[in-house]
Structure formats: C-alpha cells, structure tokens
Amino acid sequence: ELAECVGLSHGSIAIGASETALNLFLLDKLKEFHNTYPGIRLKIYNHSTPQAVEAVRRGTVDFAVVSTPVKADAPLHMTMLHPYQEILIGGTEFGHLAGKQTTFEEIMQYPLICLGKETVTFQFYRQLFASYGLDFEPDTETATADQILPLVRSGLGLAFIPKPMAKDAIDRGEVSEIRLCEKIPSRNICLIYDSKHPFKEAATQLKKMIAANSFASVE
C-alpha cells in the first residue's frame, strides 16, 4: 500500500491525444484525475490519430486517446470510450442551405473545409463520399480541428464537425446545421495502449479512470 501511495503522489504520465478526443472526452477525465492526484504531472501531446498510434507503438507516450477510424494491430489494444456524431455546418453566407435537406452531390458545388490529407478525418470523408461515387476534394485543409469552426464562421466554406463542438456557435446563430439526405456514420473516441508496455501506478490509475464505463474492447 505504501508503494502504491508513493506511486500516486508524484511522477508523470505522457498521453497522445487528438484535439477532438481532448475536447469531447479527455478534458473531464484529466480534471478528475488531477483533482484526485495533484502530484502527478501530465504531459499531453497534440497528435493526429496516426501520429498518436505510432507514439504508442514507439513507447514515447503511455497511451493515446484518439478518434476512429483507427488501425491498431497487436500488441496494441483498443478500447472504445465514447461515441459522437458529426454534422455539416455553414456560416451565415450559406444560410439558404439550412432550411432544406441537401445531398453530398449538391454540397460539392460549395467550398469545403476539412483537416489535412494525413488525418483519419480526411480519409473517413474521402471513403464516405467515394461510397456515393463522389470525389472528396476540400478547398481548404487545416492543420488542427480547432481551426475549422473559425473558418466556417468567416464564410470560407462548409465543414463536418462533431455536433457538441458546434453547439454554442449554432445557438448564437453564427453557423447553421445543414441537414443531409445521406447519413454520416457515427465515430468513436477510443483508448489505444500497448498491452506489453509496463505501466507505472499513476498511468495505470488514469487508464482505469479513462476506460471506466467503456462499451467495447478490441484486441
């Protein structure tokens, strides 16, 4: 018990996290952990999902919390944590689209904003559009998820964004949800870790806290 107390009184944990995972899920867990174990230092690395998975594989982070779709081969272990739904939004310049249902083919005539080609979000939408025989070619690619909403508000184009991240801007009337005829598949926040990686007590405790109430586990 003494060793366990010492392990939770000081030390550090390295976490790879995508912005979406951080904003939609991880922040609340980190706050809870920090309040319980204030002596543990947290190192949060801003990674795309592929970067985070590679960091886990190399052992430069203890684990990662990222968005699907994600490929994690053994010995990496993936636990699904939290589902979320994305919606299409546009600024006031595209308000005429908000009052009707629109198809993927129809929105192709408008400028689109998305994360860069190296991200799983870009690949997710490229494959989704391809399933309808369409090429997904955004006019603007961003380096981070947090850049998308300001660009939409400024009228640079339409974008797909997690619904919780768009809620405040929608409520303020800065952007509008554009209803689609096609269904956007839901995505998930997931925990990735190396099952062969030895965890210190602090990392083990945070991992348990993050995975509490998770709904699926994949080896």
Q: What is the role of each PLM region?
A:
Residues 111-132, 199-203, 207, 216-217:
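Secondary-structure junction motif
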Residues 7, 75-116:
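Flexible hinge/capping segments at coil-to-helix
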Residues 10-72, 142:
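Central regulatory/effector-binding core of bacterial HTH transcription factors
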Residues 1-14, 34-35, 73-78, 98, ...:
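Short helix-loop hinge/linker segments at domain boundaries
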Residues 77-87, 172-186:
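Short beta-strand->loop
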Residues 48-53, 57-61, 67, 124-178:
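Hydrophobic hinge/microswitch elements
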Residues 25, 176-218:
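A late-sequence structural motif
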